[in-house]
């Protein structure tokens, strides 16, 4: 499969893949979704051929996002999202908890 992307579109695709993999795997240890790691590595490995070598680092033969990439604002975007949804999730969970307690009182 071939996809024609501009440099800017490719950079956005890297961000999308990184964020998706972060959400799926950042809290996992031994039970990672390795197929997503593989896709991320395939995409980031294309950086070297496309003038974006500073975005990658190679460790034990595997390509990973570099510290420069990770420090470039991507984690701030993830944190902004987490901040935006945290209170919604908390409110919903507390409401479910409280409704459960109220329902138990009437049963």
Can you name each region flagged by the protein language model?
Residues 1-4, 15-107:
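Positively charged, low-complexity terminal tracts
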